[in-house]
Curated annotation (Swiss-Prot):
Keywords: Chlorophyll, Chromophore, Membrane, Photosynthesis, Photosystem I, Photosystem II, Thylakoid, Transmembrane, Transmembrane helix. Pfam families: PSII (PF00421). One of its GO terms (cellular component) is plasma membrane-derived thylakoid membrane. This is Chlorophyll a/b light-harvesting protein PcbA. It comes from Prochlorothrix hollandica. It is a multi-pass membrane protein. GO terms for molecular function: chlorophyll binding. The gene is pcbA. Belongs to the PsbB/PsbC family. IsiA/Pcb subfamily. One of its GO terms (biological process) is photosynthetic electron transport chain. It is found in: Cellular thylakoid membrane.
Amino acid sequence: MATTATPEYGWWAGNSRFALQSGKWLSAHIAQYALITFWAGGITLFELARYNPDVSMGEQGLILIPHLATLGWGIGSGGQVVDTYPYFVIGVIHLVASAVFGAGALYHALKGPEDLSQSDFEFAKNFHFEWDDAAKLGNILGHHLLTLGYAALLFVIWLRFHGVYDSTIGEVRVVTNPGATILSVLFEYGWFTPDHNPYFVNNLEDLASGHAYIAVVLLAGGFWHINQAPFPWAQRLLASLFSPEGLLSASLAGLSMAGFAAAYFSAVNTLAYPVEFFGPPLELKFSVAPYFVDTIDLPNGAHTARAWLCNVHFFLAFFVLQGHLWHALRALGFDFKRIPQALGSLSGEA
């Protein structure tokens, strides 16, 4: 299963136990969706219960409601919260969704086939995979890219027809032509030209065009990988990825990169993270490790929503990166269990 000589995993090894059982693998992923939506729904309702309209939202240690406010839910002029009922509805919807996902996970764990190739549904058989079948792995990658592409496209549609909070004018507004500045996204933001650092994007038109561009790229990549198996040269170049350890290492690398990008973006950007909801931009400090601090005076032990989001993303990204390195080395054939033996032999020689 893995490129190391340790094909068996204990109960604590998570999805690795199901690397050869596509049905169980699917069940584990659906269960993760259930946990994520349960957390999102529960924390949204928890934050709503402790929300104080007399205190700035950014100074209350909230992390989910500020995102909903940025999307224009229940927000009036100047970033004032005029209706909290949408937050309640969204929290409940996520809890209901978590129950649906949980039921799906239980079905696939207890009733569904362990191997999707044995499913009674032809569509489900399309998602059975073998680690030496590059076409099947490419097909699954393609569907993941489609999901991300549709999400980016959905945000563009939301910008066009509902609108989000624009911190530059203090109002919720729509973007009437969300692809108008796509050339700027490609040739200015894409090359970090002066006044076009993507981390400091300062208008909704560019934000919309960036998401429209990413949506097109992701959807094109999704359709490509669904219909085109990886080329032989790609399989040779990325041979270590066609294994459970390799796939996990690549996923963790992407997650880590996204975490570092999100940490810095949330620390400095005031368009996607308005000051009204997240607090003012942060200041970078250095100690044993880099960290970001608030630039306003708060009661002892209190932090802005921006500080929580930024620092949690940064340190999670750091530890996820260590996981990437661990699994990447295992995918390349390195056996960590030999390290104590090697150290023991050195001490014996001494």
